[in-house]
A protein has these predicted regions:
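Mature extracellular or exoplasmic CAP/SCP-family domains and secreted bioactive peptides
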Residues: 1-142
Length: 142
């Protein structure tokens, strides 16, 4: 994935609104939200989203009932190639009771979590990389 300044600007402007709900005006873009206090540790956000892997069944492309896994599937969605994130300190986040938190918003393009589709194909890493790419850390890259 590559960093995208437009997605960053969209995420930043939405984070500054301090709303704990998806941006309904984000168009055809994926989105993950994360809130944390007293400081924002990006590693915790990524660990939290990736931690949902245990609730996801790739074979059936479903989450364990009652659990969330959409953050994880968006992070690993193979056709998503752009990401941009923004963060803001909010005294109050609309939709959350805890006060004085940092809100992280990440937007993705193209979006993942498409109904009836899997986030990636099972198989050896990099086996399906396009011809003009290389395998770096078990991921297709330029």
């Amino acid at each position: 994935q590559t960093w995208d300044k437009e997605l960053e600007a969209l995420a930043q402007s939405y984070a500054e609104k301090c709303i704990w709900d998806h941006n309904k005006e984000r168009g055809r873009r994926g989105e993950n939200l994360f809130a944390m206090a007293p400081t924002l540790e990006l590693e915790f956000a990524v660990e939290d989203w990736n931690g949902e892997e245990k609730f996801y069944n790739l074979t059936t492309s479903t989450c364990v009932p009652g659990q969330m896994c959409g953050h994880y599937t968006q992070v690993v969605w193979s056709s998503t190639h752009q990401i941009g994130c923004g963060a803001h300190f909010c005294e109050k986040i609309d939709g959350l009771e805890t006060e004085d938190m940092h809100l992280l918003v990440c937007n993705y393009y193209p979006p993942g979590n498409m109904k009836g589709k899997k986030p990636y194909m099972e198989g050896p890493s990099c086996e399906m990389c396009p011809m003009d790419t290389v395998c770096v850390n078990n991921l297709c890259g330029e």
